[in-house]
Amino acid sequence: MIKWPQKVQESAHQTALPWQEALSIPLLTCLTEQEQSKLVTLAERFLQQKRLVPLQGFELDSLRSCRIALLFCLPVLELGLEWLDGFHEVLIYPAPFVVDDEWEDDIGLVHNQRIVQSGQSWQQGPIVLNWLDIQDSFDASGFNLIIHEVAHKLDTRNGDRASGVPFIPLREVAGWEHDLHAAMNNIQEEIELVGENAASIDAYAASDPAECFAVLSEYFFSAPELFAPRFPSLWQRFCQFYQQDPLQRLHHANDTDSFSATNVH
């Protein structure tokens, strides 16, 4: 049993938040007790510093708030919560939402269209999410909406716009860009061969470097067994940046489970 921090954010009724239940999602069960305790401490501070805003009738209870906070803090478990500076609100729709999108084509004509979005983030603005896709982020499938949007926030700490290169030492930028573009090309080649729907990694990763970093960050944490062997050099760069090794964590958890099973009488 994990011993939680004494100072826990409490509801209006002074009820302790349900961290133990919040941690029970598959994505977080591989963490050690020490990592889970550290993650809860960060998530507790996250809920103190950020405002979660439910929209369009979405009901936000304490368990949902805890799980949202835990997923936000997983990528910065070793980086620190200050890496999530730059926004103060998380807006949460019940389902994917419609936005007005404006874009300029190659000859300078401006177009407007309404599109359905799962999430959005801006450098100095709120993060916008939807609960249906947040729920789909609880497992180890390679999809994680919150980690995707957090990756964009981490990316923009390195400049005015997301580039696919987070804040890393300058001497490592060229190697990062080389490995990231190699991964994009590899994913694009698979798409051309088998089609977007049959591709083993989300085709969105091939659209541009910023999306490649965000999508592969999802796989880094929730499907490391797909990412690591396919892009080993880039995997090591992600491990150095996030200061975590989810594949090693997964193997350790599996070994522990196997040992426990063999010692059951």
Curated annotation (Swiss-Prot):
Disulfide bonds: none annotated. The keyword Kinase does not apply. It is found in: Cytoplasm. Its EC number is 3.4.11.-. Pfam families: Peptidase_M90 (PF06167). Its main location: cytoplasm. Interacts with Mlc. PANTHER family: MTFA PEPTIDASE, PROTEIN MTFA. The keyword Cytoplasm applies. Belongs to the MtfA family. One of its GO terms (molecular function) is aminopeptidase activity. It comes from Shigella dysenteriae serotype 1 (strain Sd197). Its cofactor is Zn(2+). Zn(2+) binds at residues 111, 148, 152, 211. GO terms for cellular component: cytosol. Involved in the modulation of the activity of the glucose-phosphotransferase system (glucose-PTS). Interacts with the transcriptional repressor Mlc, preventing its interaction with DNA and leading to the modulation of expression of genes regulated by Mlc, including ptsG, which encodes the PTS system glucose-specific EIICB component. InterPro entries: MetalloPept_cat_dom_sf, MtfA_enterob, MtfA_fam, MtfA_N. Gene3D superfamilies: Collagenase (Catalytic Domain), Glucose-regulated metallo-peptidase M90, N-terminal domain. SUPFAM superfamilies: Metalloproteases ('zincins'), catalytic domain (SSF55486). Keywords: Aminopeptidase, Cytoplasm, Hydrolase, Metal-binding, Metalloprotease, Protease, Zinc. This is Mlc titration factor A. It comes from the Bacteria. GO terms for biological process: proteolysis. Binds 1 zinc ion per subunit.
